[in-house]
Swiss-Prot record:
Deleted gene: phenotype: RNAi-mediated knockdown reduces circumferential microtubules (MTs) in fat body cells and reduces msps recruitment to the nuclear membrane. No effect on the radial MTs or nuclear positioning. However, simultaneous knockdown of Nin and Patronin, impairs both radial and circumferential MT assembly resulting in defective nuclear positioning. Simultaneous knockdown with Nin, also results in a further decrease in msps recruitment to the nuclear membrane.
Gene behind this protein: Patronin
The species this protein was found in: Drosophila melanogaster (Fruit fly)
PROSITE patterns reported in the protein's UniProt record: CH, CKK
Domain Calponin-homology (CH): 156-288
Protein name: Patronin
UniProt biased composition (Polar residues): 319-333, 432-446, 513-529, 919-947, 1065-1074, 1167-1184, 1401-1412
Length: 1630
């Protein structure tokens, strides 16, 4: 590279910067940046300032990474973070010795260190290439192309893989060509085709002739670039090469959704090796657009004779041939891609479990047979699994992107994989895109990323509400962008690159480009479930479970997928038209069938109104979706087709939208209409919310009356939820609701389930109430799922990402609508119109929670005896626990039913979980979490602890399994109180403190037991509370704390998003805060079967809701663990585990019951009043952050039997939340440890920290509020004090500065006075000398008033100048005197040509005649100084009257040889220590200090001119004659001053002139030039530097004695005319 020319370097820089811009702007580069360089006035290429700035602040790098991984977390990194990220990804930035890559270097913008930035850009290019071509993607493509079972050589690099891809494509094309030739097809000219000799591709050098690049395009796009247009010669000429590469360029510009060719044809042809990386990136982009996200123009004709049927999945590839409907359906359904590829790792694909693979294999033939039939029969509703299987049949034709992601095929549970992945080398296939590589755990990343993504999506969408519709890609502006970037199957939703949901969101969701990857499969469902953090964990297990189920039967498999399809991701997929989901209320009904709407009977009118509103909202949403879809299409017409997922989901959402080009409306119109719709949706939502609240209140009363009938009522509620939700869902394309995806697959069931009503938050986000998992046929099939159990459905539902809870979800749906007052208010004030939450930033999770909340309330009356459920669950869970997908953990089997517990109390284990899921799904999991439990702002630390607990795989849960409940003790999905979660540091500190205290107190040992007990108690309490706050608890609980944390705890509370990355924190268990003894006691109760009484105590009065601000405003320890609202106080004490339990408790129990109690406590601080929490009198922890009075660490189950309710609740929690999680979650070391603790804790987890609902009386709420106000006041005071201290410091500093300035001025003033004094003395002395000299020479001064003038002049002009003496330099370039000085004595003044001093030659110190040759020669000896030159006049040599400073370098002579005229000045300035040769007065000057005045003699520059003529003007032997003549003329002349005339600035001698300063006459003595030169003729002036032997130009307008040479205007030379512009060229000025 050392040898590379500037041209090559510039070409590479241009191509690389263009590539960077395309990726940073998601392939939509602004027009003004399409060409990154511009040419400046010197014709130099410069990078545009905007790009320089964005390189300097790392914006472009951040955007590139964010788009590449669909992860907004990359948006705020600095250069160093980016370099570290690249290194973690296995692409270290190359440094050179001369250019280290550091933040300091990269941040520079003036000048920009382009080489350093090139290193970073090239590393990004390598990363991009690796990510796109990593794993088996390329291998799968090669297999499809070649038709054989190609196996990539081990150790093959991504570059070799890409070359192999091109090589195989060219070989396949050659086969095709041979067939054409054999068929005798003529070419365009009618002549017979001949088989071309396609050169082999061994390295990138072979691509430089453009043949293989063009043929590659011809292979994929034969209609656009026929192979006959490629010039193939054995010895390619440069012309042919450029022609071929031009084909590539034109194809890129005209036929691809965005240009990928950033090089010019010449770059490729000539640069060869130096452009290799740019070529690699070009191939990568082409691979992306041909294989991963095929562009419109891509078709695969005659893939080895296998032309995909239009309805075959291959047809998907052959996009053109497939009817959009079928194709899309197929694609959306075929997430798995080819079965054969089951073990192929594709980032874009979901994980396939062995079971699922097995089932797929078994089903493959069957499905193949049904393939076309199915496509036609259920183009829209087709089950993903079916379509997948079908697709699998045609695997050879499936583009690599359709293949399952490795994770899908992965046998390991998600949790296991997650644990593994985080440690994996970033370049490994698995982890490449995972955020974990960036330092987060997968879980965290998922929830977090998803949450943020959702948020961003919402923000980025033209309309917030519209977001779900065509999910705006988080960071990506569009699918195209998304597609352009690596959407390797990562969900945008999932913050993690790979999000556990691995499933790139069911394509439906198309959240981000990732969604586009169809690879998401049912397995992904489980992943989809992961949207809820809880769901995710559970899903990990559930993945396996699903796969097992799927293995059992195709239906089961599909169902499980469907269930998981509930996954927010999957829901979006929405196979049927927008209304299809809602249209299939049957699905809901399947599960809910029994529950008629009896529970709603009381609110039938409200329901009717609400239904109408929902219908209206649904229509608006549909319209909005259409518009958004159209907008997206408009933006990315090309991309849509290339992205099957998008197509899929668009078709699903709206068949009419099939054509990507569909109604391209102006962006403005789209945006306006969307904005209007959002407003309408918000209004409707608020109305619905209000209705829901009323309804829920009515229901709450009703429920109290009908607690015995809860089971039926629940069913009814579910039905209602289904129906109403259906409209909601229908209103929103399931796909839009990332979380709703859950049931999308469930639609697979014969009857698409109506999606619960989707709520559009104030933010316009769709909130879908949770949908019952029942959609899944499995649910129906499984007895456990029996609706009566609700849990049973849950069991199946559990498979759904959300856990079986989807059914509950339906109940949760109510939450969407508005949570009954008793339900937990997702938004701290559920009762308030959602608008109130709006400020908080209600996410759909909120809305969903609200709806679910309502539903739950409604359902609660019908809630089956939760305890009974729990018991059933307990048993079933034990049985099914292992099988149950982790998601089910949230809503364990029938136990899951506890959803309501959760919902009502913890939503029961499952119910709450479901709600949670719902919420989480709807919001980012984190969001949901926070919203759920944080809605009150008081989410408990629980989220933290839950997270931690959740995190732990909870192997111990298995231990607890028998108990089931204990297992559930921590509902991973349990919502966590986020209120406690504030800053990461706070959380960490809390956890540390808690852990330490636990260790010190040995509480941890008991914590598990107690926690479990506690949980049981709490569950009971929660149930009660749930009744009071069911909605809230459930949502909180549902939030798997683990999930939350795993999700990095992005907690959104209101407008605040707290990101708490605590991926591996040990979970705090509720017990941790408990007294160990109490815990032990509690543990006993745990075993007791939960009683079947589900206490739903809905007080008519809604508990006072803590002020919403609570959440937003946190004291420095921002959210202490929920358990310790006090935690500020308690933090040290509370242990992390405890916290978990606390959280569970606080947040409606980690276990659901924990969550119930706590969230209830917290959430509903108001609601808590209703619930009976068991308090352990002894432990009173006071959470500052909770509204409640000091929370008492309740040992809910001090006696195991403590209260059946608590046991039940505990049981439910444990079972529903914990078991699945435990079994499924892989344990991180911490987790294992904790898990074991948790397992025990699960048993013992009885500790409930939180104010009992009974405790929460209005006074305590007031007290809490007062406390909050107090805290706020304190913080305000602190802030004020800080500001005052800051102000004081500033004032002091300014005073100090003032004093220093005054001192400085004083010093300067004294100096000036001293100088003035010295100047006055000097002037007097000078005057005296001048008079003496004049008398000596017998001359009289020309002007009698010379003295006065001199004095006045010196006093006026010297003083200021003297100040500059300090910095004096040799002599000024010119001596120019102001008028005052000129007047001093015309005789002596030489500075102004018009008033040259008197002709009298005042010789001061020197006795030599002023024009003596010797003295002239050594200018230094010159003593004829005019008055003007007096040091006083120019005390600083460098400053002349006009203020110009002559630098020593530019002065004509070195100091030693300074001419007399400057000498005096210099000597004064320098202290006259310089020894000037030939100057007799030097010694005198040295003695005197400053040189005294002497009557200046007319100066002569004779010596200078002689020197110039000798050494400069006529150098060398050639000019000897001319030199002699000039020297003679000078010798003969009597003139004192000589000037040389030059032709121009080149200093070519033309003539010698004499100058009379007195008369300003310039007369020619010798040479060529005008005989007399007038002032107007002068052009430039020069003076001679006798030391440097050169002339330097003097920028002055007048001739003075300091000038030694000049030029005259060009026009004066004969034959030269000034070039006037021709009139023709002149612009006509009108």
């Amino acid at each position: 590279m050392d040898v590379e020319t500037q041209e090559i370097r510039q070409a590479r820089q241009r191509a690389s910067v263009k590539w960077l811009l395309s990726k940073a702007f998601n392939n939509r580069v602004p027009d003004n940046l399409k060409e990154p360089f511009y040419r400046d006035h010197e014709n130099q290429e410069r990078l545009k300032p905007q790009i320089i700035v964005e390189l300097g602040n790392a914006t472009l790098y951040c955007q590139t990474l964010a788009n590449l991984y669909s992860d907004p977390n990359y948006q705020s990194m600095n250069h160093w973070s980016i370099i570290q990220t690249l290194a973690r990804k296995g692409v270290p930035v190359a440094e050179s010795a001369d250019m280290p890559i550091t933040e300091t270097v990269l941040i520079q913008t003036n000048p920009l260190r382009i080489n350093a930035h090139m290193s970073v850009i090239e590393s990004l290019m390598v990363l991009y290439a690796k990510e796109i071509s990593s794993g088996d993607r390329v291998m799968a493509a090669i297999r499809r192309i070649s038709g054989n079972n190609y196996q990539a050589p081990t150790g093959q690099s991504y570059e070799q893989a890409l070359l192999g891809w091109i090589s195989h494509a060219c070989a396949a094309l050659k086969k095709r060509i041979i067939k054409e030739v054999d068929a005798g097809l003529p070419d365009d000219n009618g002549s017979r085709l001949q088989t071309p000799d396609i050169p082999p591709v061994r390295d990138f050098q072979d691509l430089c002739d453009g043949i293989c690049l063009a043929l590659l395009i011809s292979y994929y796009c034969p209609k656009v670039v026929p192979w006959t247009s490629v010039r193939i010669n054995y010895l390619p000429a440069v012309e042919d090469s450029i022609h071929n590469i031009l084909l590539v360029c034109n194809f890129s510009q005209k036929h691809l959704p965005y240009t990928v060719m950033h090089m010019t044809p010449e770059d490729v042809t000539y640069m060869r090796g130096s452009m290799k990386l740019n070529l690699v990136v070009l191939l990568t982009d082409l691979f992306n657009l041909f294989e991963i996200h095929p562009a419109k123009c891509v078709c695969y004709p005659g893939m080895d004779g296998q032309v995909p049927h239009s309805n075959s999945f291959g047809g998907g590839l052959n996009r053109r041939s497939t009817p959009p409907n079928e194709y899309q359906t197929v694609q959306s359904n075929n997430f798995d891609g080819n079965h054969a590829e089951a073990f192929v790792v594709h980032k874009s694909r979901g994980i396939t479990t062995l079971a699922s693979m097995h089932s797929q294999q078994q089903q493959q033939l069957h499905q193949q047979q049904q393939h076309q039939q199915q496509y036609h029969q259920q183009p829209l509703q087709q089950h993903p699994s079916q379509s997948q299987l079908q697709i699998q049949q045609q695997e050879p034709l499936v583009p690599a992107r359709l293949r399952q992601a490795k994770e899908k095929t992965n046998v390991e549970s998600k949790a296991d994989e997650r644990g593994r992945r985080s440690r994996r080398n970033s370049s490994s296939e698995d982890s490449q895109l995972t955020i974990e590589n960036f330092g987060g755990s997968q879980d965290q990343l998922n929830t977090l990323g998803r949450y943020e993504r959702d948020r961003e999506r919402k923000l980025s969408n033209t309309s917030v509400g519209s977001y779900p519709v065509e999910p705006a890609v988080a960071v990506r502006s569009s699918i195209a962008d998304a597609r352009g970037t690596l959407q390797l199957g990562y969900d945008t939703d999932s913050g993690s690159e790979k999000q556990d949901r691995e499933t790139e969101k069911y394509s439906m969701r198309r959240q981000v480009s990732v969604d586009n990857v169809p690879t998401v499969s049912s397995h992904n469902l489980s992943n989809a479930g992961s949207p809820l953090p809880v769901a995710r964990h559970k899903q990990h297990s559930s993945d396996k479970d699903y796969s097992s189920n799927s293995g059992m039967t195709p239906d089961a498999y599909n169902d499980s997928r469907s269930t998981s399809g509930y996954d927010p991701e999957s829901t979006p997929v929405r196979k049927s038209s927008t209304s299809s989901m809602p249209a299939s209320p049957a699905a809901w009904q399947l599960d809910v069938g029994d529950d008629d709407m009896r529970s709603l009977e009381n609110a039938s009118k409200l329901s009717t109104i609400r239904m109408k509103l929902e219908e209206k909202r649904r229509r608006i949403e549909q319209d909005k979706r259409k518009i958004e879809m159209a907008l997206l299409r408009h933006q990315e017409k090309e991309d849509l087709e290339s992205c099957p997922d998008v197509m899929k989901w668009e078709t699903m959402s709206n068949e009419s939208k099939r054509t990507p080009d569909m109604d391209p409306v102006d962006l403005d119109k789209y945006q306006q209409s969307i904005a209007i719709m959002n407003m309408n949706l918000q209004d409707i939502q608020q109305d619905i919310h209000r209705l829901a609240t009323q309804q829920s209140q009515m229901q709450a009363q009703h429920l109290q009356a009908q607690q015995l009938m809860q089971a039926q009522q629940i069913a009814n509620m579910l039905n209602q939820a289904y129906n109403a939700p259906v409209s909601a869902y229908s209103s929103r394309p399931p796909s839009r609701d990332p979380y709703q995806q859950q049931l999308h697959h469930q639609q697979q069931q014969p009857m698409p389930m109506p999606q619960p009503m989707q709520y559009v938050n104030e933010h316009g986000q769709y909130m879908s109430p949770p949908q019952p998992a029942h959609y899944m046929p499995q649910q129906a099939q499984q007895p456990q799922s029996i609706y009566s159990d609700n849990g049973a459905a849950y069991n199946h539902s559990n498979h759904s990402p959300y856990g079986g809870t989807p059914q509950y979800r339906s109940s949760v749906v109510y939450d969407d609508y508005g949570q009954p007052t008793n339900h937990f208010y997702l938004h701290e004030s559920s009762p308030q119109p959602q608008a109130h939450q709006h400020p908080q930033r209600r996410t759909w999770a909120h809305s969903a929670a609200a709806a679910a909340y309502e539903q739950q309330q409604q359902i609660q009356p019908s809630l089956v005896d939760v305890n009974a459920w729990q018991t059933q669950q307990h048993q079933k869970q034990k049985q099914t626990w292992m099988n149950r997908p982790p998601s089910s953990a949230g809503a364990p089997s029938p136990g899951s039913f506890m959803l309501h517990q959760n919902g009502g109390g913890g939503g029961g284990g499952g119910g709450g979980g479901e709600l949670q899921h719902l919420f989480q799904v709807q919001a980012s999991p984190q969001h949901g979490q926070r919203q759920v439990s944080g809605s009150n702002g008081v989410q408990r630390q629980q989220s933290l602890t839950n997270l931690r607990d959740n995190r732990s795989p909870k192997a111990p849960q298995n231990m607890g399994m028998p108990m089931g409940m204990p297992m559930q003790q921590e509902d991973m999905m349990a919502p966590q109180s986020i209120c406690f979660i504030g800053d990461e540091e706070d959380v960490d500190e809390l956890e540390r403190n808690i852990i330490e205290s636990m260790q010190s107190t040995h509480i941890s040992d008991f914590v598990h037991q107690q926690q479990q007990q506690h949980q049981h108690q709490q569950q009971l309490q929660q149930q009660q509370r749930l009744q009071g706050h069911s909605g809230r608890g459930s949502s909180s609980e549902d939030y798997d704390s683990g999930e939350m944390i795993s999700n990095k705890l992005n907690i959104t509370s209101g407008n605040l998003t707290y990101r708490i990355p605590s991926p591996s924190r040990p979970s705090i268990q509720a017990n941790s805060f408990q007294d160990p003894r109490a815990m032990a006691a509690a543990s006993g109760g745990e075993d007791q079967p939960p009683e079947k009484g589900f206490y739903i105590s809905f007080d008519d009065e809604q508990p006072k809701r803590p002020k919403p601000p609570l959440r937003a405003k946190r004291s420095p320890k921002k959210e202490s663990p929920p358990g310790s609202r006090d935690s500020v106080d308690n933090q040290a004490t509370l242990k992390r585990e405890s916290l978990s339990h606390l959280h569970n408790n606080n947040n409606i129990g980690f276990g659901n019951d924990d969550v119930n109690s706590k969230p209830v406590t917290r959430h509903s601080i108001h609601g808590l009043n209703n619930s009976n929490s068991v308090k352990s009198p002894g432990n009173a922890t006071y959470n500052k952050y909770t509204d409640e009075p000091p929370i008492q660490l309740r040992q809910l189950a001090v006696s195991g039997a403590m209260s059946p309710t608590s046991n039940e609740r505990h049981h439910l929690d444990d079972v529903s939340n914990q078991s699945p999680q435990q079994t499924q979650q892989p344990m991180s070391p911490t987790r294992l440890q904790q898990s074991s603790n948790n397992a025990e804790a699960a048993k013992n987890k009885a500790l409930v920290i939180g104010a009992d609902s009974t405790n929460l009386d209005p006074e305590s709420v007031d007290e809490m509020e007062r406390r909050k106000e107090k805290i706020m006041l304190l913080s305000l005071q602190r802030r004020q004090q800080q500001e005052e201290a800051k102000a004081r410091k500033e004032i002091e500093a300014s005073q100090k500065r003032e004093k220093e300035r005054e001192k400085e001025e004083e010093r300067a003033r004294k100096k000036e006075e001293q100088m003035a004094r010295r100047a006055a003395i000097l002037e007097q002395h000078r005057l005296k000398k001048a008079i003496e000299e004049a008398e000596r020479e017998g001359k009289t001064l020309d002007r009698p008033d010379l003295h006065v003038k001199l004095q006045s002049h010196s006093s006026t002009s010297t003083t200021p100048r003297l100040r500059q003496q300090r910095t004096t330099r040799p002599r000024p370039k010119t001596i120019h005197v102001d008028d005052a000085s000129v007047d001093i004595s015309e005789a002596s003044s030489i500075s102004s040509r018009g008033k040259k001093g008197s002709s009298s030659n005042l010789t001061g110190y020197g006795q030599l005649s002023s024009n003596s040759m010797k003295r002239d020669y050594y200018r230094g000896s010159q003593d004829s100084l005019t008055v003007k030159e007096s040091p006083d006049d120019y005390p600083s040599t460098s400053s002349t009257p006009i203020g110009r400073r002559g630098s020593y370098k530019t002065s004509r002579e070195p100091a030693g040889v300074e001419r007399g005229r400057t000498l005096s000045r210099i000597s004064v300035a320098k202290g006259s220590t310089l020894n000037f040769r030939g100057r007799k007065s030097n010694s005198l000057m040295n003695l005197c200090g400053p040189k005294l005045y002497k009557q200046p003699a007319a100066k002569s520059n004779r010596g200078i001119i002689l020197n110039a003529v000798e050494y400069c003007v006529f150098p060398g032997v050639v000019n000897r004659e001319a030199k002699q003549k000039v020297l003679e003329k000078i010798a003969r002349s009597e003139a004192k001053h000589f000037l040389v005339l030059f032709r121009d600035a080149g200093c070519q001698f033309r003539a010698l002139y004499s100058y009379q300063p007195e008369t300003d006459q310039v007369t020619k003595l010798y040479g060529t030039g005008p005989s007399q030169v007038e002032e107007v003729m002068f052009d430039k002036f020069f003076k001679y530097n006798s030391g440097g032997k050169c002339f330097s130009q003097v920028h002055t307008k007048h001739l003075t004695v300091t000038i030694d040479a000049f030029t005259i205007h060009n026009s004066l030379w004969q034959g030269k005319r000034v070039q006037l512009p021709s009139k023709k060229d002149m612009a006509l000025v009108i």
